[in-house]
């Protein structure tokens, strides 16, 4: 028999009844029932119940065992007594009567329990991550992650892609975040950079004559962490294709991502035909370029209903040409309590408030409060915008300060445009859309969640297309790239030479899923003269382009094929499919929010000898 096991702890069934077996694993839990010890023995594959009674030679050793001790047991497989079976356990029909027990590795007192789902502080969990990873849910997440990556590889190969590995030590490049720098011992004063993405290398692969590349690529960015972004490093499904247009990329990628989601969605519906949503439309309808399409709410421009109205705040705003008023419909949100709650939320977000209109059914009010209630409601609904002698018939009317100020005709026009009914409400944001769009998107999300309008049991995928190539940087007071500087501008060199830079769109696209950006890519700018012009508009001269992107720029001079690609965030996809909201729940050994590895003690001071070899002298710290 093998030194440690003949079977795993998830393998035994009624087929092995009567056999002598050997198992090794962790003591998941130990219970004493009337002097008989029951040990739940756990390994990577499952859990088996082990029984040790006082007649067993193993009993004396078993009495010493505590939670998370590693033990080996020999024993005989038998059926569990009738009525004690556990149908939720793969081995739940049998148990092992132990005849021999060996302690392979005792455990100190546990700083956090492995059994159960008790929440513990993140610092404790990360410092003792090896214990945390033994917990069932996290252990399962990590296994799911590996299976998802396997599925990605298999599906990419099925689409004709070939896997390559690009260098980890490379040159610094402006990918939008700070680099992690690695000092060179052999070249004093010079540094390598860890790749923020394999962007230049994958384009060089296309210029080297290969046709379809992919890899599960580690990426390193020195940026501030957040829940959906791990500090330090992350992984992406990186790909590139030659001789393609945008739709060719979509046709290759869509079945891979859809297939992976269907395989691991546990029966939840997955979008079959992905919509293509232009960037500007996504902002206008959803307030974000990564919309959660499970939320049915669509924002609309209702400026005309407030222009010249009795609500002077909005009316004066609309005298400025660029300003608009947007409405966020709230079906079923027509209660004062809900509207006040949303108003308080808006103030907590740093806004002065959130204007609203509620719609009520006057006929229902009449039944409840009589004729006087109807007259009072009618009088209030007339408002300053109604005009003398205006008569409102009983029916659905607007209520609230905005409705009182703009009058029933405008209020009814808003209701009709938004397709709302009695018991519904709408919230309003006004001003420069460029400045309020982010808040409007947050408000749409908040309304959808508060009113339980979001179907949590499905995955909605969409392409976001037609991103602006440039944006104006208020901080630097200049035009800069809005996304990937290597993307092809729509209209090519001619657009760069003749159009207002802020009007140029790029062959740039993202994949949005349930409110997250899970992939981004573009058709590449493969003509050197167009590349130089694109960077010139953003403030980089030709010499800078040659210095910073020398390898790729040189390759462009020797016959570069039209090409494009994208990168999908492995971590975010796994996070969504595992049903968690924090990336640390799907990563083996993550850092904390301060970018500290509490388990390994990184970052740490380097030894003086190491620093001397690298020709580095730490600067004195300011006091």
Curated annotation (Swiss-Prot):
- The protein's predominant localisation is cytoplasm
The enzyme class is ligase
Biological processes per GO annotation: aspartyl-tRNA aminoacylation
| A cellular-component GO term for this protein | cytoplasm
The residues that the entry says bind ATP are 221-223, 517, 569-572
Sites binding L-aspartate sit at: 175, 221, 483, 524
InterPro entries with a match to the protein in the record: Aa-tRNA-synt_II, aa-tRNA-synth_II, aa-tRNA-synth_II/BPL/LPL, Asp-tRNA-ligase_1, Asp-tRNA-ligase_1_N, Asp/Asn-tRNA-synth_IIb, GAD-like_sf, NA-bd_OB-fold
Q: Where is this site: Important for tRNA non-discrimination?
A: 33, 83
NCBIfam families per record: aspS_bact (TIGR00459), PRK00476.1 (NF001750)
**Protein name per UniProt:** Aspartate--tRNA(Asp/Asn) ligase
Organism encoding this protein: Xanthobacter autotrophicus (strain ATCC BAA-1158 / Py2)
Gene that specifies this protein:
aspS
